[in-house]
Amino acid sequence: DWGRLMIREYLPEKLQSNTIILYFHGGGYVVSSVNTHDAWVKLLSSHLKARVFSLEYRLAPENKFPLALEDANSAIEWISKENNIPISEISLCGDSAGGHLAASLSTYRSLNNFELPHSQCLIYPMTDPLCNSKSQVEFSKGFFLGQNFMIWFWKQLMASDNNHADPTFNLTIDPDAALPKTL
């Protein structure tokens, strides 16, 4: 159902690339939007001289996992169809929750034997819903996004505790997924 997706397209003044990027905004899956990331995505499109599409995916806590992932998958398929290009020519990019969503989409497509995107650029992605990695514990206090705050964001997204075992949700699980080139 592509009719429910809101996707904003960015075209640079001088398009010098056939590259198409699908961008996912950050915000812990709870806050932010295409609008909050508008200036950043314009800058990205301008500097790369490439077309960028920014997706307004459904936010938690009203919309639990995997609804944002479903939105992302619908978006990449729509962009592919509308531009008559294979998904393998579309790159993904996202920051924070958006970085998680990009990696989650690549993992989902790999595990289901769907065509993979060309590449993914993950900017400080959320990866560990358990929030118990060495660095997460070591830097759990004294920073804006400390361990307790991150746990809160993950809990807003989780439909159940079973999400921890889902490799499209918990990116610290090594599922033998073949992933695209990653930066």
Q: Residue ranges of each PLM-predicted region?
A:
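Alpha/beta-hydrolase superfamily serine-hydrolase fold, recognizing
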Residues: W2-L183
